[in-house]
Protein backbone atom coordinates (compact mmCIF):
# COMPACT_ATOMS: atom_id res chain seq x y z
CA UNK A 1 0.00 0.00 0.00
CA UNK A 2 1.19 3.51 -0.81
CA UNK A 3 -0.54 6.68 0.33
CA UNK A 4 0.28 10.29 -0.62
CA UNK A 5 1.04 12.75 2.17
CA UNK A 6 0.74 16.50 2.62
CA UNK A 7 2.52 18.97 4.86
CA UNK A 8 0.35 21.30 6.89
CA UNK A 9 1.96 24.58 7.86
CA UNK A 10 1.15 27.48 10.16
CA UNK A 11 3.20 30.29 11.67
CA UNK A 12 1.23 32.18 14.34
CA UNK A 13 2.99 35.00 16.17
CA UNK A 14 2.78 36.66 19.58
CA UNK A 15 4.77 39.40 21.24
CA UNK A 16 7.33 38.40 23.84
CA UNK A 17 5.61 40.71 26.32
CA UNK A 18 2.30 38.92 25.82
CA UNK A 19 3.95 35.55 26.36
CA UNK A 20 5.58 36.80 29.56
CA UNK A 21 2.58 38.63 31.01
CA UNK A 22 -0.45 36.59 29.93
CA UNK A 23 -2.53 34.98 32.66
CA UNK A 24 -3.17 32.02 30.37
CA UNK A 25 -0.67 29.65 28.78
CA UNK A 26 -0.31 31.31 25.35
CA UNK A 27 1.97 28.57 24.04
CA UNK A 28 -0.66 25.95 24.80
CA UNK A 29 -3.49 28.09 23.42
CA UNK A 30 -1.67 28.67 20.14
CA UNK A 31 -0.93 24.96 19.89
CA UNK A 32 -4.58 24.05 20.39
CA UNK A 33 -5.74 26.59 17.79
CA UNK A 34 -3.25 25.29 15.23
CA UNK A 35 -4.28 21.69 15.95
CA UNK A 36 -7.91 22.63 15.30
CA UNK A 37 -7.01 24.34 12.02
CA UNK A 38 -4.98 21.31 10.95
CA UNK A 39 -7.82 18.94 11.89
CA UNK A 40 -10.22 20.87 9.64
CA UNK A 41 -7.84 20.60 6.69
CA UNK A 42 -7.20 16.93 7.36
CA UNK A 43 -10.92 16.14 7.52
CA UNK A 44 -11.50 17.80 4.15
CA UNK A 45 -8.60 15.90 2.58
CA UNK A 46 -9.67 12.52 3.98
CA UNK A 47 -13.04 12.92 2.23
CA UNK A 48 -12.27 14.86 -0.96
CA UNK A 49 -8.47 15.09 -1.28
CA UNK A 50 -7.20 14.49 -4.82
CA UNK A 51 -4.06 12.64 -3.75
CA UNK A 52 -1.73 15.27 -5.24
CA UNK A 53 0.58 16.29 -2.38
CA UNK A 54 -2.26 15.46 0.01
CA UNK A 55 -4.24 12.42 1.20
CA UNK A 56 -6.56 10.80 -1.35
CA UNK A 57 -10.09 11.19 -0.08
CA UNK A 58 -12.39 8.18 -0.14
CA UNK A 59 -14.95 10.10 -2.23
CA UNK A 60 -12.44 10.58 -5.06
CA UNK A 61 -11.87 6.88 -5.76
CA UNK A 62 -13.74 5.24 -8.66
CA UNK A 63 -17.32 4.33 -7.77
CA UNK A 64 -19.25 1.42 -9.19
CA UNK A 65 -22.63 -0.18 -8.58
CA UNK A 66 -22.33 -2.85 -5.92
CA UNK A 67 -23.48 -5.52 -8.38
CA UNK A 68 -20.29 -4.88 -10.40
CA UNK A 69 -17.99 -4.21 -7.45
CA UNK A 70 -14.28 -4.80 -7.99
CA UNK A 71 -11.29 -4.14 -5.75
CA UNK A 72 -9.97 -0.62 -6.24
CA UNK A 73 -13.41 0.97 -6.44
CA UNK A 74 -16.06 1.89 -3.87
CA UNK A 75 -19.36 0.07 -4.16
CA UNK A 76 -22.59 2.08 -4.40
CA UNK A 77 -26.23 1.26 -3.71
CA UNK A 78 -28.97 3.25 -5.49
CA UNK A 79 -31.62 5.04 -3.43
CA UNK A 80 -34.22 4.33 -6.12
CA UNK A 81 -34.92 7.94 -7.11
CA UNK A 82 -32.82 10.75 -8.57
CA UNK A 83 -31.92 13.23 -5.84
CA UNK A 84 -33.85 11.55 -3.06
CA UNK A 85 -35.63 8.45 -1.78
CA UNK A 86 -38.66 6.73 -3.28
CA UNK A 87 -41.68 7.89 -1.27
CA UNK A 88 -42.28 5.49 1.58
CA UNK A 89 -39.23 3.38 0.75
CA UNK A 90 -36.37 5.24 2.45
CA UNK A 91 -35.97 2.48 5.03
CA UNK A 92 -35.66 -0.10 2.25
CA UNK A 93 -32.83 1.85 0.61
CA UNK A 94 -30.98 2.16 3.92
CA UNK A 95 -31.44 -1.56 4.61
CA UNK A 96 -29.97 -2.34 1.18
CA UNK A 97 -27.00 -0.12 2.02
CA UNK A 98 -26.44 -1.78 5.40
CA UNK A 99 -26.56 -5.30 3.98
CA UNK A 100 -24.34 -4.47 1.03
CA UNK A 101 -21.63 -4.61 3.69
CA UNK A 102 -20.31 -8.02 4.69
CA UNK A 103 -21.13 -9.20 8.21
CA UNK A 104 -17.58 -8.83 9.51
CA UNK A 105 -17.64 -5.09 8.80
CA UNK A 106 -21.10 -4.30 10.15
CA UNK A 107 -20.19 -4.85 13.80
CA UNK A 108 -18.26 -1.56 14.01
CA UNK A 109 -19.98 0.26 11.16
CA UNK A 110 -21.42 3.77 11.22
CA UNK A 111 -23.19 6.16 8.87
CA UNK A 112 -21.29 9.24 7.67
CA UNK A 113 -23.06 12.30 6.20
CA UNK A 114 -23.09 16.07 6.46
CA UNK A 115 -25.46 18.04 8.67
CA UNK A 116 -27.92 18.88 5.86
CA UNK A 117 -28.25 15.23 4.92
CA UNK A 118 -28.60 14.32 8.58
CA UNK A 119 -31.40 16.87 8.92
CA UNK A 120 -33.23 15.19 6.04
CA UNK A 121 -32.62 11.70 7.45
CA UNK A 122 -33.90 12.71 10.89
CA UNK A 123 -37.33 13.28 9.34
CA UNK A 124 -37.62 9.80 7.84
CA UNK A 125 -40.25 7.50 9.35
CA UNK A 126 -41.21 3.87 8.99
CA UNK A 127 -44.65 2.67 7.92
CA UNK A 128 -45.88 2.98 11.51
CA UNK A 129 -44.83 6.61 11.78
CA UNK A 130 -41.76 5.95 13.94
CA UNK A 131 -38.60 7.91 13.22
CA UNK A 132 -35.71 5.87 11.83
CA UNK A 133 -33.29 8.22 13.62
CA UNK A 134 -33.04 7.68 17.38
CA UNK A 135 -31.44 10.10 19.87
CA UNK A 136 -28.48 9.04 22.05
CA UNK A 137 -29.51 6.49 24.66
CA UNK A 138 -27.18 7.93 27.30
CA UNK A 139 -24.75 10.76 27.96
CA UNK A 140 -21.75 10.52 25.66
CA UNK A 141 -23.50 8.12 23.28
CA UNK A 142 -24.29 8.84 19.64
CA UNK A 143 -27.58 9.08 17.84
CA UNK A 144 -28.35 6.01 15.74
CA UNK A 145 -29.92 5.24 12.39
CA UNK A 146 -31.14 1.70 11.76
CA UNK A 147 -29.29 0.79 14.96
CA UNK A 148 -25.92 2.17 13.79
CA UNK A 149 -24.22 5.37 15.02
CA UNK A 150 -24.04 8.51 12.90
CA UNK A 151 -20.91 10.55 12.27
CA UNK A 152 -21.20 14.08 10.92
CA UNK A 153 -18.68 15.11 8.24
CA UNK A 154 -19.25 18.52 6.69
CA UNK A 155 -17.16 17.60 3.65
CA UNK A 156 -19.67 14.98 2.48
CA UNK A 157 -21.87 16.10 -0.45
CA UNK A 158 -25.48 17.20 -0.12
CA UNK A 159 -28.34 15.05 -1.35
CA UNK A 160 -28.66 15.70 -5.09
CA UNK A 161 -29.15 13.72 -8.28
CA UNK A 162 -26.41 11.07 -8.57
CA UNK A 163 -24.62 12.28 -5.42
CA UNK A 164 -23.23 9.79 -2.91
CA UNK A 165 -24.33 11.71 0.17
CA UNK A 166 -24.32 8.85 2.69
CA UNK A 167 -21.47 6.48 3.46
CA UNK A 168 -21.77 3.39 5.64
CA UNK A 169 -19.00 1.15 6.87
CA UNK A 170 -16.25 0.32 9.32
CA UNK A 171 -14.06 3.34 8.70
CA UNK A 172 -11.17 2.18 10.86
CA UNK A 173 -10.71 -0.73 8.49
CA UNK A 174 -11.78 1.20 5.38
CA UNK A 175 -9.50 4.25 5.49
CA UNK A 176 -5.92 4.42 6.74
CA UNK A 177 -4.60 7.69 8.18
CA UNK A 178 -0.82 8.00 8.05
CA UNK A 179 0.44 10.46 10.67
CA UNK A 180 4.14 10.73 9.94
CA UNK A 181 5.45 12.61 12.97
CA UNK A 182 2.69 14.46 14.77
CA UNK A 183 2.78 18.24 15.12
CA UNK A 184 6.22 19.85 15.28
CA UNK A 185 6.62 23.34 16.72
CA UNK A 186 9.77 25.44 16.34
CA UNK A 187 9.75 28.59 18.46
CA UNK A 188 11.60 31.50 16.78
CA UNK A 189 12.11 34.67 18.88
CA UNK A 190 14.65 36.25 16.51
CA UNK A 191 13.34 36.56 12.94
CA UNK A 192 10.47 39.01 13.50
CA UNK A 193 11.24 40.94 16.68
CA UNK A 194 9.36 41.93 18.83
CA UNK A 195 7.22 38.95 17.80
CA UNK A 196 7.87 35.33 18.64
CA UNK A 197 7.02 33.05 15.73
CA UNK A 198 5.73 29.51 16.16
CA UNK A 199 6.72 27.59 13.04
CA UNK A 200 4.30 24.66 13.11
CA UNK A 201 4.22 21.73 10.68
CA UNK A 202 2.61 18.32 10.39
CA UNK A 203 2.85 15.61 7.73
CA UNK A 204 -0.21 13.46 7.20
CA UNK A 205 -1.39 11.05 4.53
CA UNK A 206 -4.25 8.69 3.90
CA UNK A 207 -6.14 6.47 1.53
CA UNK A 208 -8.45 3.48 1.31
CA UNK A 209 -6.88 0.29 2.60
CA UNK A 210 -9.88 -2.08 2.46
CA UNK A 211 -12.40 -1.46 -0.32
CA UNK A 212 -14.83 -4.01 1.16
CA UNK A 213 -15.21 -2.08 4.41
CA UNK A 214 -17.59 0.72 3.31
CA UNK A 215 -20.33 1.44 0.77
CA UNK A 216 -22.01 4.60 -0.53
CA UNK A 217 -25.68 5.40 -1.02
CA UNK A 218 -26.07 7.03 -4.44
CA UNK A 219 -29.19 9.13 -4.90
CA UNK A 220 -30.18 7.76 -8.29
CA UNK A 221 -32.87 5.57 -9.80
Residue ranges and their predicted role:
Residues 1-221:
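Structured, hydrophobic secondary-structure cores that serve as assembly/anchoring elements
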Amino acid sequence: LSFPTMELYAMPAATAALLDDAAVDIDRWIGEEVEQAFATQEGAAFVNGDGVAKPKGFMTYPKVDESAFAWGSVGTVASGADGGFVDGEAADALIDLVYALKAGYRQNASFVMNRRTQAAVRKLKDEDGNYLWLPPASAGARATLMGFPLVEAEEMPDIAAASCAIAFGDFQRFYLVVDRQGVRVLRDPYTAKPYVLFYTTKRVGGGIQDFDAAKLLEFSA
